Amino acid sequence: MMITLFIDASAYPSPRDLHASLKRMLSLPDYYGMNADALYECLSERREPVHLWIYSSGEGDTARSLSTVCAVIRELGGTVRTIGPERSEPV
């Protein structure tokens, strides 16, 4: 089984808002630390990979945070694709 998420990071004014949304969408535990290290820890405890579709990677700190989230997802065997106007994967 694979978990599929669709994200428009331009809707999140801060990295914390992005992580709060990930916490909700992925049903992460209350102790989730709202950062990439905590995301790695929580997702590595699961068996199902995450498939992330990105409409927009956002700007500034949110874009940098999303880039780190993408790296975590890829490292754990998931995939990341861009479907919006940017049409390129985050760095």
For each of these PLM feature ranges, what is it?
Residues 1-91:
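Positively charged, polar, low-complexity stretches
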